[in-house]
Amino acid sequence: MIRVLAVLISVVFLAACNGAADLNKAPVPLGDFNLVHNIAVAPKAVKGPLSREVSKAQLTKALTDATEERFGRYNGSRDYHFGMSIEGYVLAQPGIPVVFAPKSILIINLTVWDDAKNVKLTEKPHQITVFESLDQGPVVGSGYTKSAEEQLKNLSQNAAKAIESYLVKMNKEKGWFRGNGAPAAVVADTDA
């Protein structure tokens, strides 16, 4: 009985870990948000030890595609821009099943701009580190089960989900995407 319960919990946990798992649902509330420019660069991207090789163009395209896939669902009236810099990555190679299953990692820096105010919302770039989803081959490793492109797509989708989570947090804490883009306290003052 305990084993069955553990398996069920594991399945639910694995499903929840994929950055693209919720794309078929309505987007999480993010205020009056519309992404206009979605720019990724990789001038200093560091390939981690034992990583598979991908080009900088592949890195940036995967991240911009995943970001568009997630944020293209928002259609608010206020425009915002993302500047994303890929700082490092590891695309896991095949390991030794069960004993050593390397994991893939992506590290990015995010800058968010408010178009109407022409200001940067992130005082300094916000760093995000994501790992591959656990459904990518937790026992044998994604190096055996996925191509480098598939690993990169998964990491990029996880990064886009992490960006969304960060923006939801900042909107709640600082009111980044409220009706007029001002923090909640300022909105209350201007409505009076």
Where are these regions (language model features)?
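N-terminal, post-signal-peptide region of Sec/Tat-exported proteins
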Residues: 53-79
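A structural "domain/chain start" motif
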Residues: 17-61, 172-192
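Sec-exported extracytoplasmic/periplasmic mature domains
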Residues: 64, 68-72, 91, 160, ...
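Short secondary-structure transition/capping segments
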Residues: 19-32, 114-134, 161-176
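Short secondary-structure boundary motifs at beta->alpha junctions and helix caps
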Residues: 47-53, 119-162
